Curated annotation (Swiss-Prot):
Keyword Zinc-finger among UniProt keywords: no
Locations listed in the record: Nucleus membrane
Region (Disordered): 372-411
Lineage, highest ranks first: Eukaryota, Metazoa, Chordata, Craniata, Vertebrata
Subunit: Monomer. Interacts with CHMP4B. Interacts with CHMP5: this interaction allows the recruitment of BROX to cellular membranes. Interacts with SYN2; this interaction promotes SYN2 ubiquitination and facilitates the relaxation of mechanical stress imposed by compressive actin fibers at the rupture site.
Organism from which the protein derives: Homo sapiens
Protein's name according to its UniProt entry: BRO1 domain-containing protein BROX
Known role: Nuclear envelope-associated factor that is involved in the nuclear envelope ruptures during interphase (NERDI) repair, where it is locally recruited by CHMP5 and reduces cytoskeletal stress through its action on SYN2 to help reseal the ruptured membrane.
GO BP terms: mitotic nuclear membrane reassembly
Length: 411
């Protein structure tokens, strides 16, 4: 289902040469610097390469991160940091703040920023794959897995590496914990969307589908709440998307809960549940329009134009009409004024992030190699200020053309 998921832009970064004239005193140190430069450039290239797959991304990321670890961790695995942690200035933009970059003289800042982009790549890969016209079951599983991997990376960055930063992120920057938490939750919610679509296709019990939809709506509500204190200028569009998805899946929950109530001969309550679904679906449609008119980072997706979205509208309408007919012929039950409380708990299909760890330090790092970096030889005028050649150019992301919508993005 092309463009069903909202995506913020990739982070952009200034080139890094890893040239330390005078400091590097041996061939092994020189080789590490060359390998860092080339592996970083290769990883950045893959972010916008449409032929890149998860295996290629993992190999390229592991190659760079294992080398970068030597700038962060001591070789004896003690808690002491590497003497090289603060040797290089790194400069990155943020997904919500346009092309206004942040810079820190800290390899941990680089590790988190690049890791963040790797997680974003997995979300964009999942979105592209979900947009294929005739997606196979294996591809659907890969969409599901990619979103869980992304959630795991974001979670690991937030819990294990953000606390290590010397300079905490400013409000609304990517490395602020609230922002990363919103990405974690969104990835979980979108992975559960795949589960729901699969459950609908396989005609699982309405009670299970209702519970999954309700849990997914709660995820979207939680992500939206996490962003509530950010400036609307850069968060409004993303929040509209989260809000419309919350309304959409709450409508799904009420629709399938209505089917469950009807099966239990509670026709009056079923009608009220479906009326609530109808109201929420209309609200989701209105929010789709508002989302399309809201300015902000990322390309505008069009959920209301998708068959998967429209199918729910037809399902609500037909099921409500069926319940009203049954009530007029058989049950004659009073329709409650209040919508039923959704106290649904899914026992199956809930998404947890796939645990993530950065690779261990490359075997190229030895005590002798580390000793070949002599910090006493740093030039006197070596300053933390970004050099003129470190201009941060926006990432040119490939356009993804919508394909014919089959309405079945996980079959």
């Amino acid at each position: 289902m092309t463009h069903w998921f909202h995506r913020n832009p990739l982070k952009a970064t200034a080139p890094v040469s890893f040239n330390y004239y005078g400091v590097v005193t041996g061939p092994s140190a020189s080789k590490i610097c060359n390998d860092l430069r080339s592996s970083r450039a290769r990883l950045l290239e893959l972010f916008t390469d449409l032929s890149c797959n998860p295996e290629m991304m993992k190999n390229a990321a592991d190659s760079y991160f294992s080398l970068l670890q030597g700038f962060i961790n001591s070789l004896d695995e003690s808690t002491q940091e590497s003497k090289l942690r603060y040797i290089q200035n790194f400069k990155w933009t943020d997904t919500l703040q346009g092309q206004v970059p942040s810079a820190q003289q800290d390899a941990v800042f680089e590790l988190i920023s690049m890791g963040f982009n790797v997680a974003l790549w997995y979300t964009k890969y999942a979105s592209r794959l979900a947009g294929k016209e005739n997606i196979t079951e294996d591809e659907a599983k890969e969409v599901h897995r990619s979103l869980k991997i992304a959630a795991g990376i974001f979670k690991h960055l937030k819990e294990s590496h953000l606390p290590k930063l010397i300079t905490p992120a400013e409000k609304g920057r990517d490395l602020e914990s609230r922002l990363i938490e919103a990405y974690v939750i969104q990835c979980q919610a979108e992975a559960q969307e795949v589960t729901i679509a699969r459950a609908i296709e396989l005609k699982h019990a309405p009670g299970l589908i209702a519970a999954l939809a309700y849990e997914t709506a709660n995820f979207y509500q939680k992500a939206d709440h996490t962003l509530s204190s950010l400036e609307p200028a850069y968060s409004a569009k993303w929040r509209k998307y989260l809000h419309l998805k919350m309304c959409f899946y709450t409508a799904y929950a009420y629709c399938y809960h209505g089917e469950t109530l009807l099966a239990s001969d509670k026709c009056g309550e079923a009608i009220r549940s479906l009326q609530e679904a109808e109201k929420l679906y209309a609200k989701a449609e209105a929010l789709c329009k508002e989302y399309g008119e809201t300015k902000g980072p990322g390309p505008t997706v069009k959920p209301s134009g998708h068959l998967f979205f429209r199918k729910l509208g037809n399902l609500v309408k037909n099921t409500l009409e069926k319940c009203q007919r049954e009530n007029g012929f058989i049950y004659f039950q009073k329709i409650p004024t209040e919508a039923p409380q959704l106290e649904l708990k899914a026992n199956y299909g809930l998404v947890e992030p796939i645990p993530f760890e950065f690779p261990p330090t490359s075997v190229q790092w030895t005590p002798e190699t580390l000793a070949a970096f002599d910090l006493t030889k740093r030039p006197k005028d070596d300053s933390t200020k970004p050099k003129p050649e470190e201009e941060v150019k926006p990432v040119k992301e490939p356009d993804i053309k919508p394909q014919k919508d089959t309405g079945c993005y996980i079959s």
